[in-house]
Swiss-Prot record:
Gene3D superfamilies: 2.40.160.120, 3.30.70.3490, Pleckstrin-homology domain (PH domain)/Phosphotyrosine-binding domain (PTB). May be involved in the transport of sterols. CDD domains: PH_ORP_plant (cd13294). Disulfide bonds: none annotated. This is Oxysterol-binding protein-related protein 1A. One of its GO terms (cellular component) is cytosol. It comes from the Eukaryota. Residues 495-501 are annotated as: Conserved. Residues 287-329 are annotated as: Disordered. It comes from Arabidopsis thaliana (Mouse-ear cress). Residues 299-323 have a biased composition (Acidic residues). Signal peptide: none annotated.
Amino acid sequence: MYAATPETPFGSARSQPVITRSVSQRYNHPGQSNHHHLLHSLSFNHQNVLALPAAAREPPVDVKINDIAGNSIAGILYKWVNYGKGWRPRWFVLQDGVLSYYKIKGPDKIVVIHETEKGSRVIGEESTRMISRNKRHAATNNTNHQLRRKPFGEVHLKVSSIRESRSDDKRFSIFTGTKRLHLRAETREDREAWIEALQAVKDMFPRMSNCELMAPTNNLDISIEKLRLRLVEEGVSESAIQDCEQITRSEFSAIQSQLLLLKQKQWLLIDTLRQLETEKVDLENTVVDETQRQAGNGDSEETISESDDDNEQFDEAEEEMDTCDSLSSSSFKSIGSVFRTSSFSSDDDGLTNGFESENDDVDPSIKTIGFNYPHVKRRKKLPDPVEKEKSVSLWSMIKDNIGKDLTKVCLPVYFNEPLSSLQKCFEDLEYSYLLDQASEWGKRGNNLMRILNVAAFAVSGYASTEGRICKPFNPMLGETYEADYPDKGLRFFSEKVSHHPMIVACHCDGTGWKFWGDSNLKSKFWGRSIQLDPIGLLTLQFDDGEIVQWSKVTTSIYNLILGKLYCDHYGTMKIEGNGEYSCKLKFKEQSMIDRNPHQVQGIVEDKNGKTVARLFGKWDESIHYVMVDQGKVNESHLLWKRNKQPENPTKYNLTRFGITLNELTPGLKEKLPPTDSRLRPDQRYLEKGEYEMGNAEKLRLEQRQRQAREMQERGWKPKWFRKEKGSETYRYIGGYWEARDSGSWDDCPDIFGQVHQSIK
């Protein structure tokens, strides 16, 4: 793909943007020629839309990044690999807007000498000494070092951000959007030199403004003036000439607008392609490295190999919550062995209470709490589809929506699952028995076990998202959902309370506790991935008055263009309240080839900040805890384990619990208000596999939904929730279950039309 050149000894000459004359006048570096480099196919100096005579056009001056920032920067930096290897030296080269790195030890090492780095600026005394040592060695052995290996990894600075460590003046990190590179220089001065060089090159890639993207209008004036002179010579009347000028300017303006939109889309796609190129190189190098490792060492689990993404295991010490200090790797070796050898059993229904053989010391009466409710028979599978689903490319649907708000994008029902966002809120309460047990622990005076169970509940809500790649239905304004589950000892209710921004509020009455909250997702569409940042607070109140609050972590969906779609959750979750203990949970971000994804680690602290317990596990499997006694790690115990998946999984990968959420049990339809999600026609058609009818109804409801903003602007208010005074949080005002008992739905809006009456 790239041709090797004398200026690029690593054989990776890359395309570079061409910068206009004004930039070249600011940065004048004569003698630094790079004529062998490939020029970027897109020039910052765009051609005029209207053709001009050659004399009227000034040729652009091609200035490359190395002309501005000098020739390549090179030197040794220490890169964080993993907890087994720690910091390892790598030879880094900054050239053509790309930071590449190479191994300097082992069979894949490169040998750097003065001739191969001629013209490069070398940072660091250690780097200079290494070049000198290699030069003497090369002279003694008469070795040819011109053949260079491919880089072990690459980072494109245009799509990366640089961050300096606040706790260590030698460290910094580079975030590419998909991974983070943790680096450490030899001295503080070396770090400053690297940061300055990296930032200087990154500044060469400014985001193009609209005025830069649009063609210059002064050339248009010249062309129109020439057109006027020609028409005058032909004897055309003044009114006709003015009409021609107006038509020309109007057409030119329209073309400019179209060009602007096309260029913006083009640059977004270029960003995406650069990231894909980097990931391709990373994956190829990792596959080669793993193949060589397995060939030499077999499949031993004790061997720790480096992959380019292993640094994802390392968390910045200056982050808001860093469990690395309190959750040392040595302490987790013993915990991990217990975790791996634990024997998990489950009953025929795939339901467990999270306390098994390794928790025999727990009071048996606690184990049964949350499981002593009356049994209710519910469905175990979705209806068989009536129609065969069409194959539709997700990329073909989203490529025109790069940069847009996802909440405004209308997709066919093929990309939905037969649940609404209101029902998804209730799905987070699948393991509500943990709150029942937390309530009981508090009654018995054990507030530590209470906070541990609350933490396990906060994690358990993410278990159902594993393998779920379809989008839930966006509720209509005023849409509601009820869940009366006596078999779980709770009643749940939710309502869409705002259209823009899209906010869903919920309230749940459990056994000894109440739970409420609202959710507003802030979405970012990166072309190849979607990032969802939850905005809102979840509140849990026990009958004894203790209140606990937390917020959800970030969720991202990856591989929208290439590869298998998957979602990941990452960030820090703080669980705090007016009780004796608080908890901090760290959801670790998954790398592209992570061998142990979905990890969660956390600590429980008392009011004095002393760590009294630790948690670990995976959000899609189980959570364990260990008590901390004067710094000693005790035996681990199981808090929560995910229920078994259905015997016949659905195409949507719904859990056993999720399959029941949209069910119309006998006699339920007559009790529901006309706003309930179970009566939404497009969602019901999708569940039954009637895709054509589902698409038609979805389009009809989307058109109806466009009136929601006008309704909201006219002062529309939700029926069952109100904002708390002095707060943006919505609280349930009551009255729903009373109206349900009396069947008083006359004042409820018919948001779906009359179609729901025919749904069976």
